[in-house]
């Protein structure tokens, strides 16, 4: 098979990959028998007037492969395609007296730890404090409609984790070949095939709900068991290793291998683990607000005159700013093209935002978190101090919104000048169950507000309209990542203080996003399987 790299074509190119490959290789399309799109990325930088283009990597099956490779041997962009074999999964051999492994949490890390363990024949038991995705979707919809929060079933807790109510982005920095196993599992469960090759793949919250349900069904089919409404409320240790779990304050489950994928919002579980002697540390995170624009503004910002073309995807953006005066980084995060701002609280009397898009990204509005870095020195460095810091922000936001889960909202111009009252926004804030004008600067810490203000002024200079006076800001965004890290050995992936306990994913402080969390869960499961061989 031949690999063609860096095949660049206009964004509105209508020829098929087969025709493009044939032209690049100098053969007739009839000589090409198969083309796999390995990678497809949009170059919309438009530097020095350059047009927008798609860049492809293609794997091609063609007549006369040897001759083609010989003829093009000096062409650095054409060569023989690499081939990767399937992931080797060490088999699990049940032994008398050996408890089956337990997975705590059914977000991306927990799902793929359980998926790999089940594939190996280990028949894992999954314990998820929240509800299955169908019930969870109903509970969340009721919260958004009425303001009645279920602390056990919400945007943070339940099947699929917090990512179920997000944009479903599958971007990752890692080039680990095991990522392909995750992508293929998603596709087999109903995700669009384009996630195999797009540079910025996403599933969308609407499709993701079906995908996570099918992954659960596959785990059960392979011998696993999944229990919902089952919260781990205590752990038992013996001689420095995990021995058992207590669920819902009553049932005791013997366990000598526990994969801890609790998510970044399991604050009560963090406290329980810390009290039980599991070693943890405070870590940096970030807090801020959500900003919203009309999607066509973002499309014009990125595509210029080509905005609106059916050949181009809904545009996104990524912005960063180093606030030298305040000594903090400020950046956009979890940008949701064609999406909505959603209520993501998991505790009564607390308010937190998040962003969400469907697969088609057709809501007409774009939103992104704008976050300011926070370090342990901002909250005294205590292990659980970051949780207290987050809670204080969320309580202030809840109060500022009126105490009924409406979110505080403020126009950029008012935020920068310290006023409130503007109601004529460039786009109607999408947060449900609604918004209320408030001073976001009184909710965020002074240092964070100052850094955010300087970032908004900087971005408005770079991208006129981004920080315009009538652009709405909705707060508060406080759950971008875990506020602490559960310490683990770099090789065995077990807790440094509790043998047999495998902290995994975003909640353990070792991942950020669906793909990195899923990979972390897989790696921990592989480490366990290799250890017991």
What are these regions (language model features)?
Residues 1-52, 58-189, 193-533:
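Residues forming the flavin
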């Amino acid at each position: 098979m031949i690999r063609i790299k860096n095949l660049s074509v206009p964004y509105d190119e209508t020829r098929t990959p087969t025709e493009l490959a044939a032209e690049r290789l100098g053969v007739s399309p009839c000589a090409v028998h198969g083309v796999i799109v390995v990678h497809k990325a949009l170059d919309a930088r438009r530097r020095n007037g350059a047009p927008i283009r798609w860049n492809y990597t293609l794997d091609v099956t063609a007549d006369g492969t040897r001759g083609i490779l010989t003829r093009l041997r000096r062409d650095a962009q054409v060569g023989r395609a690499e081939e990767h074999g399937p992931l080797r999964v060490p088999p699990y051999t049940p032994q008398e007296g050996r408890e089956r492994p337990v997975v705590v949490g059914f977000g991306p890390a927990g799902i793929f730890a359980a998926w790999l363990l089940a594939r190996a024949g280990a028949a894992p038991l999954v314990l998820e404090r929240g509800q299955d995705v169908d019930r969870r979707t109903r509970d969340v919809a009721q919260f958004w409609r009425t303001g009645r929060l279920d602390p056990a079933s919400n945007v943070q807790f339940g099947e699929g984790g917090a990512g179920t109510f997000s944009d479903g982005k599958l971007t990752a920095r890692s080039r680990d070949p095991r990522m392909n196993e995750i992508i293929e599992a998603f596709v087999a469960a109903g995700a669009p095939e384009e996630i195999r090759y797009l540079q910025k793949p996403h599933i969308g919250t609407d499709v993701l709900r079906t995908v996570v349900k099918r992954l659960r069904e596959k785990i059960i089919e392979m011998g696993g068991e999944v229990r919902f409404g089952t919260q781990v409320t205590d752990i038992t240790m013996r001689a420095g290793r995990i021995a058992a779990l207590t669920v819902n304050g009553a049932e005791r489950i013997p366990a000598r291998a526990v994969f801890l994928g609790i998510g970044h919002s399991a604050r009560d579980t963090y406290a329980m683990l810390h009290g039980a002697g599991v070693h943890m540390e405070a870590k940096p995170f970030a807090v801020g607000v959500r900003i919203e624009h009309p999607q066509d503004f973002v499309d014009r910002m990125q595509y210029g005159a080509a905005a609106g073309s059916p050949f181009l995807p809904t545009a996104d953006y990524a912005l960063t700013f180093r606030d030298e005066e305040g000594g903090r980084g400020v950046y956009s995060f979890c940008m949701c093209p064609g999406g909505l701002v959603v209520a993501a609280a998991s505790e009564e009397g607390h308010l937190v935002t998040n962003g969400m898009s469907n697969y088609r990204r057709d809501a007409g509005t774009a939103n992104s978190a704008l976050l300011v870095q926070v370090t342990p020195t901002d909250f005294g460095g205590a292990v659980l101090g970051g949780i207290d810091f987050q809670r204080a922000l969320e309580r202030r936001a809840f109060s500022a919104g009126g105490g009924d889960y409406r979110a505080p909202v403020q126009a950029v111009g008012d935020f920068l000048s310290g006023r409130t009252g503007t109601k004529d926004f460039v786009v109607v804030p999408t947060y449900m169950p609604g918004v209320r004008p408030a001073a976001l600067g009184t909710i965020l810490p002074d240092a964070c507000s100052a850094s955010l203000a300087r970032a908004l002024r900087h971005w408005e200079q770079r991208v006129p309209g981004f920080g315009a006076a009538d652009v709405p800001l909705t707060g508060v965004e406080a759950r971008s990542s875990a506020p602490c890290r559960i310490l683990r050995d770099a090789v065995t992936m077990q807790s440094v203080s509790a043998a047999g306990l495998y902290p995994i994913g975003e909640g353990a402080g070792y991942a950020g996003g669906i793909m990195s969390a899923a990979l972390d869960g897989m790696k921990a499961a592989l480490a366990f399987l290799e250890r017991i061989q």
